[in-house]
């Protein structure tokens, strides 16, 4: 499965648009990691616990988007975007979405 943030793929022609593919996950903070991040935010520096959590969440959302596109029979997903929203205190949703398409070589 080709995943692209652009609306075209070099060397490929989009032959059919299948619809929006999407995948999401909701991640909550871990109390122990939250305390460490709180301390780090006071003294400065990267909040590595949150960076890792968000990286894992993005990967889960991408994988779920790909599964959704595969169900539609897609060869690729173009115009891929991410969106983050707070769903409750201490929890965030990561949404990956794009256009599922059929492609062929030029």
Curated annotation (Swiss-Prot):
<protein>
    <recommendedName>
        <fullName>UPF0145 protein MA_3383</fullName>
    </recommendedName>
</protein>
<dbReference type="InterPro" id="IPR002765">
    <property type="entry name" value="UPF0145_YbjQ-like"/>
</dbReference>
<dbReference type="Pfam" id="PF01906">
    <property type="entry name" value="YbjQ_1"/>
</dbReference>
<comment type="similarity">
    <text>Belongs to the UPF0145 family.</text>
</comment>
<dbReference type="InterPro" id="IPR035439">
    <property type="entry name" value="UPF0145_dom_sf"/>
</dbReference>
């Amino acid at each position: 499965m080709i995943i692209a943030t652009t609306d075209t793929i070099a060397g490929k022609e989009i032959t059919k648009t299948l619809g929006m593919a999407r995948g999401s996950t909701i991640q909550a903070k871990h109390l122990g990691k939250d305390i460490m991040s709180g301390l780090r935010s006071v003294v400065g520096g990267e909040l590595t616990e949150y960076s890792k959590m968000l990286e894992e969440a993005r990967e889960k959302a991408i994988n779920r988007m790909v599964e959704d596109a595969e169900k539609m029979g897609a060869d690729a997903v173009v115009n891929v975007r991410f969106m983050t929203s707070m769903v409750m205190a201490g929890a965030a949703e990561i949404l990956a979405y794009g256009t599922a398409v059929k492609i062929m070589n030029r």
